[in-house]
């Protein structure tokens, strides 16, 4: 019952938010915030109640906390949701960042609040569903349910001065996402029907599709389909074109939800599906994937350095870091996979904070152009110090979760692909160039605008402080995350290796 609440609570909250303005204008934000907090409390309750991370060692993938309800039985489709250590970590951090996004929207959203929070909670519902789905058809439904509400969030609640560009950015996101969804659906159907022809069992059940051999050529085609679908959403080069546009147009709350939460569904899906369902083809594709990741690291860093728009710079920075995550996923090394988990969480926190800080600067100066800024260190309290901290975290300074994630990934990759690890390390050095360049352009030098000294409000300060403490906690005590996710990651790696041995024997 508790597991079903993870879907029911945010889904109902979206409709309550939509109709609640008839009672009071402030009700939608409170309903949305309460819905996310309630979802987080349910996750925490399951965390302490189930001991799933102990159970998983010997019973993978038969989840201890699982709900299976017949749905479209004729086609083998079930409402099948479950939790393990990896998914529960993603749920906790997604809920936390969604709460941060709601707080950011508190003073930004003044019109059509009911419709805004309706769309926001539908996106949150889709994200939760992606992390807990164990049926491929259900996974696809949640993957796609985020598309339409995300389109409205981008088109209707972005930069008010250039509405035409808002719709162009939203249309670009829609086209990329539709392409991703079409490729994913085609690949799922090809996998399911290939399994049916081999076993005479029609099913979309993740557990039943594991370790069931299909034709190697079909497996490779399906694996490529899954990979391309997830690569578009990560995104990695050359599928990144939609991200800078929508990020530069979105409000702070939208940016936090898109880059901080939404983008992390794709690397999660690569871990959960590609490594386990397509082990042999993934193994043969791994060298291509890691060099693809190298290209993304260097390209994202170079383009970030050339940007004058601060929010586009943050978007390209995210593309660069996604390249590192891609390398870790395809390294076939358990330590690197643990680093991927830490890096996903740390990058989400860092980018969310930078989005919020850049949003505060834009709110006061009405520009995202760094060439029009300068000398702001003496004009703004709190923001320069926080910006310096998160810029240093973004380049992987020790004491932050980013350093732990990068260290684990690079050390794990070095055991398998030494040259790739060295190239990735060189690429990461470029992040220090654009990160420090941002600080220099915005906060140092002569002041280019006549502005008065001002403070940011308490709400903004406490939001950033929460992100600082969480990021430092990951950097100083990553063992907590590793312990919870260890058995999930260990078993994903074990299933990957065992499947290869079975196929080759």
From Swiss-Prot:
Which reaction is this enzyme known to catalyze? a quinone + NADH + 5 H(+)(in) = a quinol + NAD(+) + 4 H(+)(out)
Just give the chief location class.
membrane
Q: Which cysteines are joined by disulfide bonds?
A: none
Membrane topology category: Multi-pass membrane protein
**GO cellular component assignments:** plasma membrane
Which UniProt key words apply to this protein?
Cell membrane, Membrane, NAD, Quinone, Translocase, Transmembrane, Transmembrane helix
User: Which biological process annotations from GO are given for this protein?
Assistant: ATP synthesis coupled electron transport; electron transport coupled proton transport
**Recorded E.C. number(s)?**
7.1.1.-
Q: Which domain of life is it from?
A: Bacteria
Q: What class of enzyme is it?
A: translocase
Q: Its function?
A: NDH-1 shuttles electrons from NADH, via FMN and iron-sulfur (Fe-S) centers, to quinones in the respiratory chain. Couples the redox reaction to proton translocation (for every two electrons transferred, four hydrogen ions are translocated across the cytoplasmic membrane), and thus conserves the redox energy in a proton gradient.
Assembly and partners are described as: Composed of 13 different subunits. Subunits NuoA, H, J, K, L, M, N constitute the membrane sector of the complex.
Q: Which family does it belong to?
A: Belongs to the complex I subunit 4 family.
This protein's name:
NADH-quinone oxidoreductase subunit M
From which source organism is this entry? Buchnera aphidicola subsp. Acyrthosiphon pisum (strain APS) (Acyrthosiphon pisum symbiotic bacterium)
Q: Which gene encodes it?
A: nuoM
């Amino acid at each position: 019952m508790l597991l079903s609440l993870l879907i029911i609570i945010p889904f109902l909250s979206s409709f309550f938010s939509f109709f609640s303005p008839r009672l009071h204008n402030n009700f939608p934000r409170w309903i949305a915030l309460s819905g996310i907090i309630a979802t987080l409390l349910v996750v925490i309750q399951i965390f302490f109640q189930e001991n799933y991370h102990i159970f998983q060692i010997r019973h993978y993938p038969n989840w201890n906390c699982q709900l299976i309800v017949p749905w479209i039985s004729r086609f083998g489709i079930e409402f099948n949701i479950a939790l393990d250590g990896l998914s529960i970590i993603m749920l906790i951090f997604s809920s936390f960042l969604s709460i941060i996004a709601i707080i950011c929207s508190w003073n930004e959203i003044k019109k059509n609040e009911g419709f805004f929070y309706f769309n926001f909670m539908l996106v949150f519902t889709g994200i939760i569903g992606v992390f807990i789905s164990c049926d491929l058809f259900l996974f696809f439904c949640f993957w796609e349910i985020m598309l339409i509400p995300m389109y409205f969030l981008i088109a209707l609640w972005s930069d008010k001065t250039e509405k035409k560009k808002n719709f162009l950015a939203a249309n670009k996101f829609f086209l990329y996402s539709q392409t991703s969804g079409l490729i994913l659906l085609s690949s799922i159907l090809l996998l399911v029907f290939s399994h049916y022809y081999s076993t005479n069992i029609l099913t979309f059940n993740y557990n039943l599709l594991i370790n069931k051999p299909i034709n190697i050529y079909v497996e490779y085609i399906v694996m490529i389909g899954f990979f391309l679908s997830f690569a578009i959403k990560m995104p990695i080069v050359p599928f990144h074109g939609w991200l800078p546009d929508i990020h530069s147009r979105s409000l702070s709350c939208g940016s936090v939800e898109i880059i901080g939460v939404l983008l992390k569904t794709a690397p999660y899906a690569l871990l959960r599906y590609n490594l386990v369902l397509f082990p042999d083809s993934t193994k043969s594709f791994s060298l291509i994937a890691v060099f693809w990741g190298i290209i993304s690291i260097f390209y994202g860093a170079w383009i970030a350095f050339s940007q004058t728009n601060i929010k586009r710079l943050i978007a390209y920075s995210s593309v660069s870091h996604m390249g590192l995550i891609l390398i870790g996923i395809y390294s076939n090394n358990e330590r690197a996979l643990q680093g991927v988990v830490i890096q996903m969480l740390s990058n989400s926190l860092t980018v969310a904070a930078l989005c919020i800080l850049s949003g505060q600067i834009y709110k006061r100066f009405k520009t995202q152009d760094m060439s029009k800024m300068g000398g702001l260190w003496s004009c703004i309290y709190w923001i320069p110090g926080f910006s310096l901290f998160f810029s240093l975290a973004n380049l992987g300074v020790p004491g932050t979760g980013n350093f732990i994630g990068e260290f684990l990934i690079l050390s794990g990759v070095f055991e398998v692909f030494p040259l790739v690890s060295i190239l990735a390390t060189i690429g990461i050095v470029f992040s220090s160039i654009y990160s420090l360049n941002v600080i220099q352009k915005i906060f140092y030098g002569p002041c280019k605008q006549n502005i008065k000294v001002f403070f940011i409000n308490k709400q903004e300060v406490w939001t950033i402080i929460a992100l600082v403490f969480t990021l430092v906690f990951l950097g100083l005590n990553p063992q907590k995350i590793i312990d919870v996710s260890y058995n999930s990651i260990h078993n994903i790696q074990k299933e990957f290796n065992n499947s290869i041995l079975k196929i080759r024997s």
